[in-house]
Amino acid sequence: LFPYTTLFRSGYTDLLVNNRSQAPVQELEAAGAKGATQQEIGAQCDVVITMLPNSPQVKEVMLGKDGVAAHMKPGAVFIDCSSINPVASKEIYAELQKKDVEMLDAPVSGGEPKAIDGTLSFMVGGKQEIFDTYKPVLDAMGASTVRCGEVGAGNTTKLANQIIVACNIQALAEALTLAQKAGVDPELVFQAIKGGLAGSTVMNA
């Protein structure tokens, strides 16, 4: 729940929170947030934000039996910060539209450290006017918030991001293995090249 802790610190204090494990909920409750069921969140919140492991979990929480969506009011907005299949994002949005509920798919990059300090990067898909209205909410949790297109574009951009990250990791592994086999200390290679063109956030992670 790190992003939501940052959201709370930024002044969004009227928060209802839910999590599978209770320790993070209790931490936010101690700060002034209120623990709630999925059904209560759907019925009482104008904006619902999720960050879940994958597509099945998002669909279950939102669209499952007595899920959040069943209780959301017309005009409410769902912001999904999970990294899921773009097709699943579009499928969820199609169901939400039947209830006159809007959606932004807004996966993040940056990992736990950036979640803690509020410097995540958000890749967002959704209508321009919905993005413009709720961008301040995402800005409260991140350092970069970019609209990439309609719903599904956020998770498509996240896929592109992960391809680049994976290629960086593979190239870094091969380069440092080459250095080590040639008798050069990989740590010294890292120190020598991290400030040059080969340097990257992936390298420094």
Ranges and model annotations:
Residues S83-Q162:
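Rossmann-fold dinucleotide-binding core
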Residues R9-A31:
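NAD(P)-binding Rossmann-fold cofactor-contacting core
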Residues L15, G35, D100-L104, T145, ...:
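Hydrophobic beta-strand scaffold residues
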Residues L28, C45-V48, V58, I79, ...:
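Buried hydrophobic positions in well-ordered alpha/beta secondary-structure cores of metabolic enzymes
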Residues Y12-L16, D46-V48, A76, L120-S121:
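Short active-site oxyanion
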Residues A153-A205:
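Helical "substrate-binding/catalytic lid" subdomain
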